[in-house]
Amino acid sequence: MKQKIKVTLVKSMIARPEKHRKVLRGMGLTKLNKTVELEDTPCIRGMIHKVSHLVSVKE
């Protein structure tokens, strides 16, 4: 069974570059304080790294 990580959007997407918004939408984060549970894969880790200043991560 793969590991899961919880990602929460803690800062708004307003006035952020389009690339950051697309990454957040790709992870399923659309509203402030929304939490999603994702599989811990290198792809997801890369997405989290791009928007690390906007999200909170719990393993």
Swiss-Prot record:
Keyword Ribonucleoprotein among UniProt keywords: yes
CDD domains: Ribosomal_L30
A Pfam family recorded for this sequence: Ribosomal_L30
GO molecular function, one term: structural constituent of ribosome
GO cellular component, one term: cytosolic large ribosomal subunit
GO biological process: translation
Keywords: Ribonucleoprotein, Ribosomal protein
UniProt entry tagged with the keyword Iron-sulfur: no
Sequence similarity: Belongs to the universal ribosomal protein uL30 family.
Subunit structure, as described in the record: Part of the 50S ribosomal subunit.
Name of the molecule in the record: Large ribosomal subunit protein uL30
Species this protein is from: Desulfatibacillum aliphaticivorans
Protein encoded by which gene: rpmD
